[in-house]
Amino acid sequence: TGGGAPLCLVNDRKARISAACELLWADGEPPYYSAVYPEHKYNFFLYYKGDAEEYAPEQRTQGSITKFFRIDGTQDLISAYARPGTEDAERLPDNDETKYLMNHAGDLVYSTKSARLHVEPHLRVKHELAQVNFKVQAFDDLAAQGREIRIQAVALVIPTKAQFTVAADWAGVSHDWTDETNVPPTGIVWETERDTVYLPHENTPEEFGSTYQMENAMFNPEPGVSDPKAEPMKIGTQLLVPPVDEMGVIIHYRLITTRPDDLIPSGSLFTARYANLHFEGGFQAGKQHEVLLKVYGPQRVDLEIDGLPGWIDGGDVEIPE
């Protein structure tokens, strides 16, 4: 559907969510509920991919639908399934129909019989990616040395190909509507292949894949740091990344110096590369994280995440590039 609207897949039929949050079916006829079989049970699933690229045809089996998406750090992949909660039960009238429904909830939700009691699909939404923001700060008094470090571009080396099971066979809602451990086998398996994805900024082109090219993500003006007393400076916008605990980091930067006797010429370019970095706990799906670039000088840039100690394993700096 246009505009990257979420898709619901119900018995091979498609729908989109309108601007008014209405479910609009492609052929105009809702595929549920059955008037002939009022106790026939349905499951509902939803996914959202933004403008993620489909790199392989979808796979449909008797028990699942799997899509294959490639991300570039700007898309939020979302999954959802329908199940009622305690609040849905509290809205039900106190009558025999409700008692029957609650005694047979595992067999009747969602169905024509439950719909007549206004038990509508209650979607539980999950963000499958983590949001990562970046800041930079001087950790040595570069200003006193007549030096400044300017950041040109930052990249993460991460998996970008997702095998996304968007719908799957599931027994569905149990009799206990508060049992949140009963979930369908949907979600993402990430391929091990990695790509270099650059941190975008406001002027990075919006076309898919633009963040794979450094020239699309070079900061202009370049954020510079020299005073360790200054607050950390936010750089770029954000990256949406898989929930991984190992990745690579690449930082491109330049030295600006006013010292005529400096052994490194002003304008010299550097690249700090950190390969196979492991961080305890990793990035968590649906959560925000912050990576701080700690600049000590042209030959040392450390990394810190969420205010915790630095990454396990180190990196190397090419001087100059």
Question: Where are each of the predicted segments found?
Answer:
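Extracellular low-complexity Ser/Thr/Asn/Gly-rich intrinsically disordered segments
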Residues: 4, 258, 269-277, 306, ...
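C2-type phospholipid-binding modules
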Residues: 267-290
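Cysteine-clustered segments with highest specificity for TGF-beta superfamily mature ligands
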Residues: 231, 243-254
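Solvent-exposed, low-complexity segments and loops of surface/extracellular structural proteins
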Residues: 115, 179, 186-198, 205, ...
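Extended low-complexity, serine/threonine- and proline-enriched intrinsically disordered segments
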Residues: 1-7, 144-190, 195
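Short, low-hydrophobicity acidic/polar segments
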Residues: 1-150, 158-160, 196-211, 215-219, ...
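Long, low-complexity, repeat-rich, intrinsically disordered, solvent-exposed domains used
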Residues: 236-243
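Intrinsically disordered, low-complexity repeat and linker tracts
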Residues: 283-321
